[in-house]
Swiss-Prot record:
PANTHER family: PROTEASE HTPX (PTHR43221:SF1)
Residues engaged in binding Zn(2+): H130, H134, E204
Active site per the UniProt annotation: E131
Protein name: Protease HtpX homolog
Record field: transmembrane: 1-21, 23-43, 140-160, 175-195
UniProt source species: Persephonella marina (strain DSM 14350 / EX-H1)
EC number: 3.4.24.-
One MF term in the entry's GO annotations: zinc ion binding
Compartments where found: Cell inner membrane
Source species, domain of life: Bacteria
Recorded GO CC terms: plasma membrane
GO annotation, biological process: proteolysis
Amino acid sequence: MHTIKTVLLLGVLTGLFLLAGKIIGGQTGMIIAFFFAMAMNFFAYWFSDKMALKMYRAQEIPYEEAPWLHDMVAELARNAGIPKPRIYLAPTEIPNAFATGRNPKNAVVAVTSGILNILSPEELRGVLAHEIAHIKNRDILISSIAATIGGAISMLAEMAFWSNIFGGNDEDNGIGGLIGSLLLFILAPIAAMIIQMAISRSREYAADATGAEICRCPLSLAKALEKLEMAAHQLAPVAAREVNPGTAHMMIVNPLKGSSIASLFSTHPPTEERIRRLYEMARRMGSV
């Protein structure tokens, strides 16, 4: 069901992008916007993983340095029925993890030094299972496409606004065109953000459920989420300096905490609800 919802939401997001192109340049603008979207998605497909890893200065962990971690990831990947992803370490005290890569054969799981310091092996196993679930469900590609189109919508809306301000006062545009571009400038990025949130939240719940099945212990992930949520609040000032807002949706827990506005527009569902669902899943499995 969440797959159908994701396809529909991506369709709406693409339609919004084409509409922005049409408002800027009519039929020609819509065609240009379409090919621009295709080019950006091509770029996101091939290079988004490299950009994310470089942003966090992540380095691949050789097997010799952490054989226990490699063995854990290999076991979880076997349970999920996918190839073992490469493992990277991001040198930051913020405890978090994310997955990236264009498909299961070219995937990466990245953990921070902070998460290795605060989680027990079983809790870390739950987190890694969640990230492997994202790879199995191909959420990485979907989130990259959604983020790319969403960013492009904001850019097009801004272009439309400023082109009406400085592009002359021909009769075809006039005050009506200015009002239309102003509405697009304000509403299009908000609509794109809401759609991205809906996609991301839906797939986080799915990754929690799939991850719990992969590691066969929902409580491991639930307890990890409790610790990570607490740490996210404690380290919010550090995260504000180190975390790029454009990549926060990739993390297992949103590291950007603080304001009520940030919570309102969070790409993650409430951690408390995620934990509640995992405890309910554990009860059904007889783990509690």
